[in-house]
Amino acid sequence: AGFAGDDAPRAVFPSIVGRPRHTGVMVGMGQKDAYVGDEAQSKRGILSLKYPIEHGIVSNWDDMEKIWHHTFYNELRVVPEEHPVLLTEAPLNPKANREKMTQIMFETFNTPAMYVAIQAVLSLYASGRTTGIVMGSGDGVSHTVPIYEGYALPHAILRLDLAGRDLTDHLMKILTERGYSFTTTAEREIVRDVKEKLSYIAPDYEQEIIDTTSSSKTVEKTYELPDGQVITIGAERFRCPEVLFQPSIIGMEAAGIHETTYNSIMKCDVDIRKDLYGNIVLSGGTTMFPGIADRMSKEITALAPSSMKIKVVAPPERKYSVWIGGSILASLSTFQL
C-alpha cells in the first residue's frame, strides 16, 4: 500500500489476521482481539493465523476489512474520506466480489471515489508495455493473462491454483524427510523465509539432481532458526520451486507455469501470438527465484514454433510491479477519479 506517484510502496505487510489462541494469556498487555500483518506475524506464537485472501480472491470480508482499516489508519495514517482509492483484483475475480469490495470502501470507509484494476494489467504497465502476456504468481494463485493494447483478453486467461503457499508446504514436507520438523502456522512462516532466501530454479532439473547426488557440485547452505539451531539445506533448494514447472511432484494434475503460459497464448488470435511470445512478463513474489527467466525461456522455446522469437522479462522490481503499475496509472492526468 502507498501513494500514487511514489515509486515504491510505503507499507508492505502480509495479509494475515491473528487472534489470540487463549484469552488472557498476555497479562497486562492490553490484549487486542485481533492483530494484523507484521504484528500478527511477530506474535504468531500465541496467535492463530488466518489468511482472508485465498487463491487471490477474498474469502473472509470481516478480516479483509480489518486489513484495510489497518492499512489506512496504522500504516498510511490517512483519513480514507479524503483520498480516492485504487484497489486491485485477481484476474477473473467474480463480479460479486468486486461489488462487495466497492461497497465496503464506500459504506465503511466513505472513500470519495474508487477504481478497481486487474493486477496483471498493472504489472504490464510497470514494465513499460501495453501488449504482452503476464505470468503472475503470488502467495495463493498464479495466472497467465494475455493483454493487447492495454486490455486483458478474458477468454485466454488461465488460472493455476499453485503458488507460493504450496511451495512453502512442499518445502516443509521435504525438510521433514531430512529429519527437521515444521508443522505449526508459526513454523510455516520460518520455512517461507528459508524458501525466499535459499531456493533457486535449476536450468535442467534432472541434470541438477545428477550433479548434486554425484557430489560433483555442492549446493548445501545453512540457515539459522530463531532459536539458534542451524539447519542444512541442499537439493531441497531447487526441488522446492521445481513444482512450478512440474506440479505432478505434489500430486497436482495441472500444467506447469511454462505450459500454462503457452496454452494461454494458443487461446489468442493467431495474429497477436508473435507479440505475446516476444513479451512474456513475470510478476509477483513467487517469480523471484533466481534462474526462473532462463528456465521459462528454455521451456517455452521447446513448445513454441521453432522460428518464433521468445523473450521472457523478469523486472527486478517484479515483486511489487502490480503496486508500481497502480502508482503509475493513478497518477496519470487522464486517470481522474
From Swiss-Prot:
Pfam families: Actin (PF00022)
CDD domains cross-referenced by the UniProt entry: ASKHA_NBD_actin
Reaction catalysis annotation: ATP + H2O = ADP + phosphate + H(+)
UniProt-annotated location(s): Cytoplasm, Cytoskeleton
Top-rank EC class of the record's enzyme: hydrolase
Alphabetical keyword list: ATP-binding, Cytoplasm, Cytoskeleton, Hydrolase, Nucleotide-binding
GO CC annotations, alphabetized: actin cytoskeleton; cytoplasm
Predominant location category: cytoplasm
Keyword flag Transcription regulation: no
EC number(s) stated in the UniProt entry for this protein: 3.6.4.-
Molecular function in Gene Ontology: ATP binding; hydrolase activity
Function summary: Actins are highly conserved proteins that are involved in various types of cell motility and are ubiquitously expressed in all eukaryotic cells. Essential component of cell cytoskeleton; plays an important role in cytoplasmic streaming, cell shape determination, cell division, organelle movement and extension growth.
Extra remark: There are at least 13 actin genes in potato.
Family: Belongs to the actin family.
Protein's recorded name: Actin-65
Organism: Solanum tuberosum (Potato)
